Amino acid sequence: MASRTIIGIDPGTNLLGFGVIRVEGRKAVFVDMGVLDLRKDKSPHAKLRQIYETVSEVCKTYHGDEMALESPFYGKNAQVILKLGRAQGAAMIAAAEQGIDKVFEYAPRRAKEVVTGNGAASKEQVSIILQNTLGVKFDDSHPLDATDALGVAMCHFYQ
């Protein structure tokens, strides 16, 4: 069975997380994860450009085959949903331009439920489960936005 690479994205306009796994047969292997920190930039247009450029680079570097995105969750105010939707759109366009035409969306509760068995799991709980599942140790250089993105990638792997 051929391997494939899944790129998980936790879109945000302040912090955008990404997580990359490689699927080998029936096993997921940790590749990388990180965060794009957008808090210093006040221009929404500049933030979207940075999201696009970063996601493009991640897709190109890791030769992504599929992308799993955390969808904006309901209950936040309309302005927040709109901003998150724009960030998600920038990531989707970046993926498409890098040849990734398989893009899947998962609600945060669904991703947590699939990964941990509990849709209300904390970010810390998700991180612990991912470390155990993937056999890696995360430290403070791996912000929780990155582990959220990795969780979305793992959610897609389990589907």
What are these regions, as identified by a protein language model?
Residues 1-159:
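Phosphate- and other anionic-substrate recognition elements at nucleic-acid/protein interfaces
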